[in-house]
């Protein structure tokens, strides 16, 4: 018998039963008639459940670009909807401001603005103008009249293809009203080069940010207070470049007066003269005295450089990279920077003019790929110098009263003390090598050879008959066969030198190298590009 679920019994039920009809509502809940007509609870929940908690298909799909979306409307209430909205926008280009949130959040903000922004720009105004992925045409096109308003923006300026070169005459619109900043228009040969130059409107950043001056000279802050115009005839000062001037990519390109050297008031002593004299001419084209006075107007003629005292080093100043590579920190290198013995030791201005030196003082400056010493020493130095075992510099003086110089390099710099004889120098070197057990090592060296030769030049004995004579071909490094006589802790007991002479059994053998004591510093210096 069927009964309508919530209502009373029907007439057909009364006729079939033949009994007085009893309403279904009056039946007990446990009556079999009511239990047979009940719907399962599962179906009731599926029919009457609120569908707002189900997962919307918009969560599983990328957010459409419709102006109003249910997620966007619910983003203010539900954090999950806000997260879904944020995740769906990852990787998408920024839409124009009139499309997405115009009718919801930014209608009053964007009403006063023009909606003609490009696709790659954000709706709100970006205070930082550094756009690394911006195209060339998307950089801000600001005129000279709005230069003062945008001068307080911090950030970088990306040079675009639409940047115009420096004008040949200064105009009022090209001036910048920012204090401490003068954009100087150059009327020299650097205008015609095809170097990327920054637009005048992109030079509005203040001088307080040092990274904004892309490749300007280091003293541009001191020169920014000068007058704007620099004529080619008034080149007595170093070239006063504006802080926004883009230096050429190669500082050695001919025709440029831009050269990263200190002004003429800061000179170098004799070693940089040797570097200038030893390098090919194509490395120093910008040092012409008609173009710049960085080294003074004396360099092409006399190579005279006033300035620093002899104790100073050119490594302390700014130098071109090729000169820094030529200035070797190795005391055995031919271009070692300590060249104070080129002139008299009491010179005050240290003007090392090669014409002022004696003609008997040969200056041996090899070419930059350092050749062996004997190619220069055998031809230019008298045989008396070959008896100086501790003097391995490339430039040697014949009449020097104290020819022996301690070339020990420590953390504070080279020692550079002078001695008349090699014995005094050896005694002085023992003060540097005062390590535990070092006196025992030095005492056991072959006395006939002289510990100076084995200590510094790494030269094996020439024979039992002539122990004090050195080979004619001096070498800066030891021969490749002499390294076989080093002490090997697990090898055979007594090793012999290459010439067959037995060497006393010492913990260091017959090979005592000063490089073992400061070799780590030399390798770090060579890694820095000094060697």
UniProtKB/Swiss-Prot annotation:
Q: Kindly list the ranges of residues that form C2H2-type zinc fingers according to the record.
A: 404-432
Against InterPro entries, the record matches this protein to: Elbow/Noc_ZnFinger (IPR051520), Tscrpt_rep_NocA-like (IPR022129), Znf_C2H2_type (IPR013087)
> Pfam families, per this entry?
nlz1
Q: What is its main location?
A: nucleus
According to its UniProt entry, the protein's GO biological process terms are: adherens junction assembly; negative regulation of DNA-templated transcription; negative regulation of homotypic cell-cell adhesion; positive regulation of cell migration; regulation of canonical Wnt signaling pathway; regulation of cell cycle; regulation of transforming growth factor beta receptor signaling pathway
In alphabetical order, the GO MF annotations are: zinc ion binding
> Looking at the record, which segments are called Disordered?
1-28, 88-249, 295-318
Q: Could you tell me where the Low complexity compositional bias lies?
A: 19-28, 113-122, 216-227
Q: Record's GO cellular component, any one?
A: nucleus
Cite the entry's keywords alphabetically.
Cytoplasm, Developmental protein, Metal-binding, Nucleus, Repressor, Transcription, Transcription regulation, Zinc, Zinc-finger
Give the disruption phenotype, in one or two sentences. Answer: Morpholino knockdown blocks differentiation of the neural plate border (NPB).
Q: Locate the compositionally biased regions of type Polar residues.
A: 1-10, 171-180, 199-215
Q: Where is the composition biased (Basic and acidic residues)?
A: 183-198
Where in the cell does this protein reside?
Answer: Nucleus; Cytoplasm
Q: What role does it play?
A: Transcriptional corepressor which does not bind directly to DNA and may regulate transcription through recruitment of histone deacetylases to gene promoters. Regulates cell adhesion, migration and proliferation. Involved in specification of the lateral neural plate border (NPB). May be required for segmental gene expression during hindbrain development.
Q: Which family does it belong to?
A: Belongs to the Elbow/Noc family.
What is this protein identified as? Zinc finger protein 703-B
Gene field: znf703-b
């Amino acid at each position: 018998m069927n009964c309508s679920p919530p209502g009373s019994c029907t007439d057909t039920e009364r006729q079939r039963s033949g009994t007085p009809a009893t309403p279904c509502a009056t039946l007990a809940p446990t009556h079999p008639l009511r239990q047979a007509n009940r719907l399962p609870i599962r179906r009731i929940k599926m029919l009457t459940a609120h569908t707002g908690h189900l997962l919307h298909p918009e969560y599983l799909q990328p957010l459409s670009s419709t102006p109003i979306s249910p997620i966007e409307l619910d983003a203010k209430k539900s954090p999950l909807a806000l997260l879904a909205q944020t995740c769906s926008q990852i990787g998408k280009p920024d839409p124009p401001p009139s499309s997405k949130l115009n009718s919801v959040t930014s209608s009053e903000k964007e009403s006063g603005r023009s909606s003609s922004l490009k696709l790659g720009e954000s709706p709100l105004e970006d205070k930082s103008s550094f756009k690394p992925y911006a195209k060339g045409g998307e950089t801000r096109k600001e005129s000279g009249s709005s230069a003062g308003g945008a001068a307080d923006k911090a950030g970088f300026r990306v040079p675009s293809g639409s940047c115009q070169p420096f004008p040949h005459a200064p105009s009022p619109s090209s001036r910048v009203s920012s204090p401490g900043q003068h954009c100087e228009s150059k009327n020299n040969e650097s205008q015609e080069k095809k170097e990327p130059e920054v637009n005048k409107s992109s030079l509005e950043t203040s001088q307080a940010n040092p990274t904004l001056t892309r490749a300007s000279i280091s003293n541009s802050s001191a020169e920014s207070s000068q007058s704007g115009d620099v004529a080619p005839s008034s080149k007595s000062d170093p070239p006063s470049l504006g802080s926004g001037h883009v230096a050429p990519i190669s500082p050695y390109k001919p025709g440029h007066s831009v050269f990263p050297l200190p002004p003429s008031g800061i000179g170098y002593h004799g070693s940089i003269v040797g570097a200038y004299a030893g390098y090919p001419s194509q490395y120093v084209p910008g040092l012409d005295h008609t173009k710049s006075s960085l080294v003074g107007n004396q360099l092409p003629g006399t190579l005279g450089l006033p300035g620093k005292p002899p104790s100073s080093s050119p490594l302390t100043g700014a130098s071109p990279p090729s000169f820094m590579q030529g200035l070797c920190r190795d005391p055995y290198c031919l271009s070692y920077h300590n060249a104070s013995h080129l002139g008299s030791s009491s010179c005050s201005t240290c003007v090392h003019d090669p014409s002022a030196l004696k003609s008997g003082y040969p200056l041996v400056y090899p070419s930059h790929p350092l050749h062996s010493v004997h190619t220069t020493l055998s031809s230019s130095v008298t045989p008396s110098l070959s008896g100086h075992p501790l003097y391995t510099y490339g430039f040697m003086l014949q009449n020097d009263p104290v020819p022996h110089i301690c070339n020990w390099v420590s953390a504070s710099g080279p020692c550079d003390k002078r001695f008349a004889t090699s014995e005094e120098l050896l005694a002085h070197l023992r003060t540097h090598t005062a390590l535990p057990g070092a006196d025992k090592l030095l005492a056991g060296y072959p006395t006939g050879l002289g510990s100076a030769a084995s200590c510094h030049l790494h030269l094996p004995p020439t024979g039992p008959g002539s122990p004090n004579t050195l080979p004619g071909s001096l070498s800066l490094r030891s021969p490749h066969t002499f390294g076989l006589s080093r002490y090997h802790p697990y090898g055979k007991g007594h090793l012999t030198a290459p010439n067959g002479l037995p060497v006393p059994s010492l913990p260091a053998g017959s090979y005592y190298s000063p490089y073992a004591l400061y070799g780590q510093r030399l390798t770090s210096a060579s890694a820095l590009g000094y060697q």
